[in-house]
Swiss-Prot record:
GO terms for molecular function: manganese ion transmembrane transporter activity. Belongs to the MntP (TC 9.B.29) family. It comes from Methanoregula boonei (strain DSM 21154 / JCM 14090 / 6A8). Its main location: membrane. It is found in: Cell membrane. GO terms for cellular component: plasma membrane. It comes from the Archaea. The lineage of its organism: Archaea, Methanobacteriati, Methanobacteriota, Stenosarchaea group, Methanomicrobia. This is Putative manganese efflux pump MntP. It is a multi-pass membrane protein. Keywords: Cell membrane, Ion transport, Manganese, Membrane, Transmembrane, Transmembrane helix, Transport.
Amino acid sequence: MDLLTSSLIGIGLSMDCFAVALAIGTSERLPLVRSALVIAASFGIFQAGMTIAGWIAGASLYTEISSYGSWIAFLLLAGIGIKMIYDGIREEHEPTLSGLHAIPVILLSLATSIDAFAAGVSFGVLGSTVLMPALAIGLVCFVVSCAGVFCGMRLEKLLGNRTEIFGGVILILIGIQILTDILPL
């Protein structure tokens, strides 16, 4: 598979990462560059890693877990989204993802990389190599996620504390979209 095709697949797989990074950016209170790099690195590594894992696992395992993948992503995104909304409404406000705690970032990275697993399975079924596509997907996701965090942080400056509620709603909507494939996000 050539670099252009791999990069285009990476752009498609990165759209959920962009939206989630945007939501994280609205609640983040750390230095802009550090936050963006940590979040984007986590998302990019998970996208690349899940692509490789899907390629290794092959089509038989995918058919067994594919019916659960959407539910797993939905539950992770909705749970973190509900927590963000709750924290945004509370009087004593302490951002959900402030401090870049590892668990929420890893869970969001996992939730947004389930499609990359499926892409990896398709690479395996097609007999394609996986290293170059996985690296391209991870790099594209890194760049797109950085942009999402930056945009979210700018949005937070415009809207103030309400952005955590906005970010939580975005995560829940992404979870619903993944679950139903009905909502056009």
